[in-house]
Amino acid sequence: MLSFYKIGAFEKKGRLSVGGGIHNYMENGFERCENPKGGCNAPSGGTAPVSYKDSSTVYSVEYFFSKRLINILKPFVGFNGTDKDAYYGYFGFSADLYFLNCKCFIITPTLAAGWYIDGDEIKLGNRVQFRSGGDIYYRFKNNVRLGVGLYHISNAGLGDSNPGAEQAILK
């Protein structure tokens, strides 16, 4: 039976997390005309709308600091890059929730804010983006974690548009 064991950061050391996965796997976004000579449906030389809702491969590096706030929250910094030249650097807070007596099953909710640079894919409507989500890990006896993270990235209505993007990352 799965039972909640302890809330709070168990490890006293900082932790590096690396992973890879899919950026914008739900293919949110929109199509936009990028024809400077007229509309996309112009009879002479018109172009089709350009889609900004493709998914791509994402690479992730995060560092979780050992210092805790309120004995629960751990600050962390991270960086994502995609194979379509989109980049996102962020800072946020996480909390490790341990399950089972072995403390080997961990759920880590996270919340972060950062700076996003659009690449050749989804346009998120603003440079400032917020990321919410979490990780589900199995922690081995040597403290190595293996898991998956699911996240939503959004500008929270700060920009002209707010299509948002989702990420699934194996860590």
Question: What does each model-identified segment do?
Answer:
Residues 51-56, 79-91, 101, 121-127, ...:
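Solvent-exposed loop/turn segments connecting transmembrane beta-strands
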Residues 62-66, 94-98, 135-139, 147, ...:
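Transmembrane beta-barrel domains of outer membrane proteins
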Residues 26-56, 122:
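Surface-exposed strand-loop-strand hairpins of Gram-negative outer-membrane beta-barrel proteins
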Residues 17-18, 25, 164-171:
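Outer-membrane beta-barrel "beta-signal"
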Residues 1-12:
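Cleavable N-terminal export/targeting peptides
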Residues 57-115:
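Gram-negative (and chloroplast) outer-membrane scaffold detector with strong preference
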Residues 14-16, 68-73, 103-105, 142-148:
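Repeated loop/turn-to-beta-strand initiation elements of outer-membrane beta-barrel proteins
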Residues 23-25, 82-84, 114-118, 151-155:
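Structural signature of outer-membrane beta-barrel domains
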